[in-house]
Amino acid sequence: MKIIRFTTQQGKEVMGCDWDGKTASLVEQSEDYTFSDTGERVEVVKVLPPVEPSAIICIGLNYRRHAKETGQEIPKYPAIFMKYPGSLAGHGDAVVIPKCASDPPEVDYEAELGVVIKKAAKNVSEEEALDYVLGYTCTNDVSARRWQKHAGAFQWTRGKSYDTFCPCGPVMTLTDEIPDPQNLAIKLRLNGETMQDSHTSDMVFSIANMISYLSQSSTLLPGTLILTGTPEGVGFTRKPRLYLKPGDRMEVEIENIGVLENLVEQEE
């Protein structure tokens, strides 16, 4: 099942399934995070991020070919950083380039598979880790490269946490439709041209490994969103470098999830 969060004509925030681009069927959610289709179809007025995350945890340099294109060594352990929950944006929302990241241009795209945690996870083994996953979604780890590097090492939070810098959606595909998250095609198109075209099998650390590793230090709370790294093809490694500008259209497409689309705007 693919779950969508949205607002109705009455302004209510609800969850649905079987979204056809205009309407969706309302779903009921139980305490154990199972969903049932009510069969009642309503108009989708505004698509919302499919999750309201308690935390957004990100993993850097997690695709082998991406590490190679940046000239960096593959990490021995997952490289962890955070994005502020306030950076979340939905399908169709504008990604706004802040004034401080406009001159010179520096804002980049990063297609990523997002993982939504279902239940509290602490000291979870790799073998049981996927039992703690509710579903998967498309995300875009938008990054202001100059600000990302100010603190050095992997202290990237500020450059990746500006408002709207974490587009997410349009739906969350539940685990019953994605039994193997390491077997998904992932792409990003910029103004219709494919910039990233890869596969989750190129990940250095698997989804199960990441969840197990993260749960050893802190309890992963329900609703935690994990961004699992971006593949090769980002803008700053290109010659000449390619950065986002107002009017650009980004599309993140992940197999069996859908297409997350966002336009780029400039902060006034």
What label would you give each PLM region?
Residues K122-Y136:
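N-terminal accessory regions of nucleic-acid-interacting proteins
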Residues A121-S125, E177-D180:
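Short helix-loop capping/hinge motifs at secondary-structure junctions, enriched
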Residues T7, C58-N62, M82-K83, D108-K118, ...:
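Short beta-strand segments
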Residues I74-H91, V107-Y109, K245-N256:
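Structural signature of FAD isoalloxazine-binding scaffolds in flavoprotein oxidoreductases
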Residues H91-V116:
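A structural-propensity feature for long, helix-poor, extended segments
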Residues D37-P50, H66, P98, R145-E268:
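Catalytic-pocket segment enriched in acidic/His residues
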Residues M1-A79, E251:
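N-terminal non-catalytic cap/leader segment that marks the start of a structured domain
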